[in-house]
């Protein structure tokens, strides 16, 4: 029976490269001269430290542009609240979304059911498996899910016929 898996994963090497490029650009830009802006990767979160809210926003814009250039979806980033750090610094934690949560999996399953195609979806840990008798139905499910804005970065893998 044909099937495929829906997963949400991020290439950590590309994330590391994007962060390194961001740090390099911050060091070279004139508007960041003399500032103490930092971007660090800690397991599955990114810590951004800046002098003020304006510089924090600028650093995050640079980071997002580097992510897009490296084919990492901005949907895979979850932004925490900007908070005061030591001194006059501002800190923001950005979490990388790896895996599909149970709530998102249920939401995706509901979207699949609404298509009224003859396919079944089942939640397996942090991924979703979709099976059906017809490959065309599975391709239609992929098309529908790509068209929906579900606020999650999805990849479709293990397409078996």
From Swiss-Prot:
> Can you list the GO cellular component terms from the UniProt entry?
cytosol
Alphabetically ordered keywords of this record: Nucleotide-binding
> Where does this protein have coiled-coil stretches?
none
Q: Which GO terms describe its molecular function?
A: nucleotide binding
Entries under Gene3D superfamilies matching the protein: 3.30.70.860, YajQ-like, domain 2
| One Pfam entry name | DUF520
Which protein family is named in the record? Belongs to the YajQ family.
Give the protein's biological function: Nucleotide-binding protein.
Identify the NCBIfam families for this entry: PRK05412.1
- Which PANTHER family did the record assign? UPF0234 PROTEIN YAJQ
Q: Which HAMAP family match?
A: YajQ
What name has this protein been given in UniProt? Nucleotide-binding protein GM21_0633
From what organism does this protein derive? Answer: Geobacter sp. (strain M21)
């Amino acid at each position: 029976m044909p099937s495929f898996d829906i997963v949400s994963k991020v290439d950590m090497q590309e994330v590391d490269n994007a962060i390194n490029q961001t740090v390099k650009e911050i060091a070279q830009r004139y508007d960041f001269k003399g500032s103490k802006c930092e971007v660090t990767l800690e397991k599955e979160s990114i810590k951004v430290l800046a002098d003020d809210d304006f510089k924090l926003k600028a650093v995050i814009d640079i980071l997002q542009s580097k992510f897009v250039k490296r084919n990492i979806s901005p949907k895979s980033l979850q932004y925490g609240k900007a908070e005061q750090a030591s001194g006059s610094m501002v800190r923001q934690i950005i979490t990388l979304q790896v895996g599909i949560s149970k709530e998102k999996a249920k939401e995706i399953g509901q979207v699949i059911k609404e298509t009224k195609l003859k396919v079944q979806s089942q939640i397996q840990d942090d991924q979703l498996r979709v099976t059906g008798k017809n490959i065309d139905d599975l391709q239609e499910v992929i098309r529908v899910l790509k068209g929906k804005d579900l606020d999650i970065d999805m990849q479709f893998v293990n397409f078996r016929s």
